Regions:
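Arg/Lys-rich, positively charged N-terminal/basic patches that mediate binding to nucleic acids
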Residues: 1-41
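Residue-level signal for alpha-helical context at structural boundaries
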Residues: 29, 33-40, 52, 56, ...
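Short, basic alpha-helical nucleic acid-contact segments in DNA-binding proteins
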Residues: 41-47
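Basic/aromatic recognition patch in beta-strand/loop cores that engages polyanionic ligands
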Residues: 48-86
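Enriched for short, Lys/Arg-rich terminal
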Residues: 72-76, 80-111
Length: 111
């Protein structure tokens, strides 16, 4: 059975900005295709078949809940899993300083 998922406000904002940039840069067809790629990866996470990695090895802090990431297109989907659902914490471009951004996200996920 697939897990339900939800987005944090930060994840919603990041997805909106990605959609806007992709639309303005590459047009509506590519924006729609990239949105579908992201939705497909979210479905794969929900079904437990996404290739993911723990962020713990990139962090100097311990978190109560493991923060995971998976790659789609030019972005990383950062999320936390729970028994019945997962929460998309943020979407980061592959060129960001991943350990620094993950530390910030993980510190917020502690609460």
């Amino acid at each position: 059975m697939s897990k339900a998922w939800r987005l944090t406000p930060q994840a919603e904002q990041s997805l909106y900005e990605i959609a806007q940039w992709t639309f303005q840069t590459f047009g509506p067809r590519q924006a729609d295709a990239y949105e579908q790629d992201i939705l497909d990866r979210l479905d794969a996470i929900a079904d437990g078949i996404a290739h993911n990695r723990s962020c713990q090895s990139l962090l100097d802090i311990k978190t109560e809940r493991d923060v995971l990431y998976t790659h789609v297109g030019s972005h990383y989907l950062i999320y936390a899993e729970y028994d019945e659902h997962f929460v998309l914490l943020d979407v980061l471009h592959q060129r960001v300083d991943l350990p620094r951004r993950l530390a910030h996200i993980a510190s917020k996920a502690k609460s």
